[in-house]
Regions:
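Conserved class I S-adenosyl-L-methionine
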Residues: 233-257
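Conserved alpha-helix/loop element of class I SAM-dependent methyltransferases that forms part
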Residues: 117-135
Length: 334
């Protein structure tokens, strides 16, 4: 069945409301639609068309998914919970051709590897020093994006890397760009919540701010551990936020969800504190995006700068300035 993107967003929103046990009147549904940001479609005609297709029922006071609509709604809610699915559909191709993004990467990360994350070159070097990769080892890059960082690591350390990402455009970009390096680089579209990795096949795992999208940390970590060879290790960067009123102790390294999951699994790990560095990173990222905004817009890539500025101003700088964020590098020995 062919659906418009507006219809897809309505179905995903109804499923979100169902999962969260929230009311589904039209006003409340649309009040939460700002999570789609600039990618929000006009839903005006979508309710009626979805009813005609037999996928929803009800009226403005409350819509419900039909038996036919529920499986589709589950699929779209999983795939497109917020703006990021839409963002990544556009980002990789745009960034590859963007001189403004190349300049931002040089200013913020210290080198242009077409980055879209929070790990600059100094932090990446710290992670690689801990992992101590040996020539010929097999490495898994979780959430590899377009694979430029994976390619850089493979070239520098003479290792083979498999990159995994849920975004089809990212994997397509990575595969096309690295055709000549197929013996060392492989890229797969996949879901970190449903890993299917051969036992004893991996020497090291790299995760640069990707485990936020895992629904069950212990389950995913267990699947990774099964795939690890003896002496395997993981390098994981993650941020941790607390809300207003939460105790500051919840930001301690031993109190994070990742630390608790690793402890429950009986895994040996250490942490390095990168909280100061993440503050410096986001201030630099915000300034570079603002300074380069007109260049991005002149390329037709204004959404990249707008997204970085929005993230900095809404998601990061307030928590950084009020001490409600911590960042750690986890070194895990399996």
């Amino acid at each position: 069945m062919e659906l418009s993107e507006a219809e897809v967003q309505v179905l995903a929103s109804l499923e979100k409301a169902r999962v969260e046990s929230k009311d589904t009147d039209r006003h409340l549904l649309e009040a939460e639609a700002d999570r789609f940001w600039i990618f929000l479609e006009d839903w005006s005609d979508a309710y009626f068309s979805l009813q005609k297709k037999g996928l929803i029922e009800g009226d403005q006071k409350g819509y419900r998914l039909t038996e036919s609509g529920h499986p589709l709604a589950q699929q779209y809610h999983h795939q497109r919970p917020d703006m990021y699915w839409y963002y990544y559909q556009r980002f990789y191709q745009a960034a590859r051709a963007s001189a403004a993004h190349s300049e931002l990467c040089r200013q913020v990360f210290g080198k242009d590897l077409c980055q879209e994350g929070q790990t600059d070159m100094a932090a990446l070097d710290d992670l690689l020093e801990l992992l101590d990769l040996k020539p010929g080892e097999e490495v898994l890059d979780l959430g590899c994006g377009a694979g430029v960082i994976a390619e850089h690591i493979s070239d520098q350390k003479d290792v083979s890397i498999t990159g995994l990402d849920y975004a089809d455009p990212a994997i397509a970009e990575a595969v096309e760009r690295t055709k000549a390096k197929r013996s060392k680089l492989k890229f797969l579209q996949g879901d970190m919540n449903a890993l299917d990795l051969p036992e004893n096949s991996i020497d090291a795992v790299i995760s640069l701010d990707t485990l936020y999208w895992v629904s069950n940390l212990e389950k995913t970590l267990s699947m990774l551990m099964i795939a690890m060879r003896p002496g395997g290790r993981m390098g994981i960067f993650m941020n941790h936020h607390i809300a207003d009123g939460d105790d500051q102790s919840e930001l301690a390294p031993e109190s994070t969800d990742l630390s608790k999951a690793l402890t429950n699994l009986g895994v040996s790990f250490t942490t390095r504190d990168f909280t100061v560095q993440i503050g410096d990173f986001w201030r630099k990222n915000w300034k570079a995006a603002a300074d380069l905004k007109q260049r991005f817009e002149s390329e037709g890539n204004g959404f990249i700068a707008e997204s970085l500025i929005r993230e900095a101003e809404e998601d990061y700088l307030p928590d950084i300035n009020s001490g409600k964020i911590a960042r750690y590098l986890y070194y895990v020995q399996c």
